[in-house]
């Protein structure tokens, strides 16, 4: 499956860049989210599963920015891989969540 080139978080479009960004190599992390301008960087040299966890990690930061939950970095570090694992191990759940429900009035 093709990696996403952008994601929507609330009303904002965030380009997703998978690159060996020199700015990231100087930091102790593998990804970054910027809210002005909107952009998510994911370290391209990470293996594919780690890239997915990194992107989900940055998305959680983006959601937190939008709805002001106040998640700590430690909480995001624990939530991202747990959520990724939940979604990957339950494809029927993911399919059901993504379906348009039959609306009856």
Where are each of the predicted segments found?
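Active-site recognition of the HExxH zinc-binding catalytic motif
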Residues: 53-65
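Metalloprotease/metallohydrolase-associated module, dominated by Zn2+-dependent proteases
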Residues: 1-49, 66-105
């Amino acid at each position: 499956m093709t990696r996403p080139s952008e994601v929507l978080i609330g009303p904002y479009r965030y380009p997703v860049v998978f690159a060996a960004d020199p700015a990231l190599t100087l930091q102790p992390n593998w990804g970054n989210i910027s809210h002005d301008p909107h952009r998510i960087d994911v370290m391209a040299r990470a293996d594919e599963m780690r890239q997915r966890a990194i992107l989900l990690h940055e998305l959680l930061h983006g959601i937190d920015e939008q709805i002001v939950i106040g998640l700590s970095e430690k909480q995001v570090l624990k939530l991202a891989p747990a959520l990724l694992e939940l979604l990957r191990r339950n494809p029927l759940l993911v399919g059901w969540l993504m379906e348009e429900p039959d609306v009856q009035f």
